[in-house]
Amino acid sequence: MPDLLIELRSEEIPARMQRKAAGDLKKLVTDALVEAGLTYEGAREYWTPRRLTLDIRGLNARSADMREERKGPRIDANDKAIEGFLRAAGLSSISEAHVHNDPKKGDFYVAHIVRRGREAEEIVADVMPAIIRDFPWPKSMRSGAASAIPGSLRWVRPLQSIVCTFGAEHDETKVIPFEVDGIVASNITYGHRFHAPEAIAVRRFADYAEKLGKAKVVIDAERRKEIISADAHNIAFANGLELVEDEGLLEEVAGLVEWPKVLMGSFEESYLAIPSEIIRLTIKTNQKCFVTRKPGAETLSNRFILVSNIEAKDGGKEIVHGNGKVVRARLSDAAHFWKRDQGDLPDLETLAASAGKFGLDLKKPLDQRMAKLDALNVTFHAKLGTQGERVARIRSLAAALAKITGADPASVARAAVLAKADLRTEAVGEFPELQGIMGHKYAVLQGESAAVANAIEDHYKPQGPSDHVPTDPVSVSVALADKLDTLVGFWAIDERPTGSKDPYALRRAALGVIRLILEGRARLPLLPCFDVALASLKLQRPAMAADVSGDLLAFFHDRLKVYLRDLGARHDLIDAVLAPDADDLLMIARRVEALTAFITAEEGRNLLAGTKRATQILAAEEKKGTEVAASVDEELFRLDAERLLYASIKVASDGARAAIAKEDFRSAMEALSKLREPVDAFFNDVLVNDEDKAIRANRLALLGLIRSATGEVADFSKISG
């Protein structure tokens, strides 16, 4: 079967857009082909800085004929109805229609319509111009003389050529001709911009990839990443060093080169006095270079690794020299930031009021930056006040949390006040991703305790599902306060995540709270925390506080479900223990854990079956309005199975309640498991719907006791199986 090759070659595409753009091309083209009636065996996308490529294998040469039956009016319908049917069906005469009989509706006309298939070349030529014109680039531009013409092509960078060939594996391929803004599809591409700029005639993908490889273009981005990684590790090893891995940078650099050549540069060792994080970010952000270190060392070496797109005749000496000059200049700036951040700010007398508000020591650089942050009234959010106001809220909430975490109150207060101070440092101004990290370093330099310094860095954590979770009580208190203030604040102003939109990363903040609580085994009722946070916000409409708390707790429940499911918990078991007002997340998780162990055991499965049977019978009778006794009357028992079940429920309920009071949910489940045999015996020996109304009502009340007993730990009706 034929293969289709498409290449869209342009000037340099931003690295961050390449992977998605290639995926978009694949989806748009394959969707259009399938919609037009073509099928294919496989498709794969490729990309380089200058081209998007699509290789489709086993594409049908022609779409199949389509047959359709279109129902028309009855044969005795008026002329107007018949004429409308003929027009809609594309028939020239009613004699071309068929007559079908329906026993109920009588005879009616049916048109048998055949839509002839189309050649694949025709379909491709038909769909490609619109795909290119409407391509979903996040940013695009017009170029050339046609750019002034309304409706002219927009592309991420000027589009230069289009390749579109089609043909079976052992046959000659054809060019599928179509045109977009004067660019005509052909079988001609071009190699590396500098090493092989000549035209190259290609047929199908294998031929295309081979010829581009000879023209110093590695078409496969994953292969470019492998080359860069292997060569970088090798050159580092050869110099007695190891590469500091950076997957994000590797992805970006692979999108900057078509023919990767790995080189090593260096800078003066004196710059190693700058924190490693600043060195790494300076070199990464400005020069897209990797850093190295001695094997097993924490600190960096003065060697960096760069990736060139050119195979230089001098072995890359000039490239290394040029990059080294820029790296040194950037590190010189970084050293300046680092030094200035440790010095005094000017006009300290203007910061006295802010210093007094937060108990700051203006002899210390980090305290000065916090005072400056407050004095400048830097906005956190238009509806949530300034950064200074936010720090005051975090301090208040962290103080309340310290009573629960057992953290030292003075350390918590100090860490909360300094947590955002590094936002006014020059290092964080240059590299925002260093917030917290630089605060920790400056805190250590000015003599803060380890607990305070660590909390300044760790209060942003965890920032994702795999990030480190702080365990020190001071860090946990400030981290929880920071995230809860954010969540309560944005809920209070009705800025909540919707669908895929979460501009303030509130889902991540909620996950952070969940991980801090569960992984730290913290008993932290959320609703009182919401109350403290809401009180600090000074809402204009206090009545809305209850709505905010309820909605936010429901949001936490949703995120907790996702988190527990990711850990392997069953969704129905989570639902079974999750009451609407449950705000102790650790207790919810422990109940799910205990219920999971119980339900997977034979006793649990059998009790579940019996409990669900009891619940279903009771629910059905309640729905019909059947009388259910308010309480069980032992005098109405007629069978030993009734007496045994009643006595067993009392013992199991007492045992379960006592275990729950001790927060021993496994023992609570074990207590309930003793109901299995009495429940089985009851349903084997007892007819619930007895003819005597009083006995029936009493037996239904007994079923209600089963439901109530198991309901102490979970709503068994929500458990599947």
Swiss-Prot record:
<dbReference type="GO" id="GO:0006426">
    <property type="term" value="P:glycyl-tRNA aminoacylation"/>
</dbReference>
<dbReference type="InterPro" id="IPR015944">
    <property type="entry name" value="Gly-tRNA-synth_bsu"/>
</dbReference>
<dbReference type="GO" id="GO:0004814">
    <property type="term" value="F:arginine-tRNA ligase activity"/>
</dbReference>
<dbReference type="Pfam" id="PF05746">
    <property type="entry name" value="DALR_1"/>
</dbReference>
<dbReference type="GO" id="GO:0006420">
    <property type="term" value="P:arginyl-tRNA aminoacylation"/>
</dbReference>
<keyword id="KW-0963">Cytoplasm</keyword>
<keyword id="KW-0436">Ligase</keyword>
<dbReference type="InterPro" id="IPR008909">
    <property type="entry name" value="DALR_anticod-bd"/>
</dbReference>
<dbReference type="GO" id="GO:0005524">
    <property type="term" value="F:ATP binding"/>
</dbReference>
<protein>
    <recommendedName>
        <fullName>Glycine--tRNA ligase beta subunit</fullName>
        <ecNumber>6.1.1.14</ecNumber>
    </recommendedName>
</protein>
<comment type="similarity">
    <text>Belongs to the class-II aminoacyl-tRNA synthetase family.</text>
</comment>
<keyword id="KW-0030">Aminoacyl-tRNA synthetase</keyword>
<keyword id="KW-0648">Protein biosynthesis</keyword>
<comment type="subunit">
    <text>Tetramer of two alpha and two beta subunits.</text>
</comment>
<dbReference type="GO" id="GO:0004820">
    <property type="term" value="F:glycine-tRNA ligase activity"/>
</dbReference>
<dbReference type="GO" id="GO:0005829">
    <property type="term" value="C:cytosol"/>
</dbReference>
<dbReference type="InterPro" id="IPR006194">
    <property type="entry name" value="Gly-tRNA-synth_heterodimer"/>
</dbReference>
<keyword id="KW-0547">Nucleotide-binding</keyword>
<keyword id="KW-0067">ATP-binding</keyword>
<dbReference type="Pfam" id="PF02092">
    <property type="entry name" value="tRNA_synt_2f"/>
</dbReference>
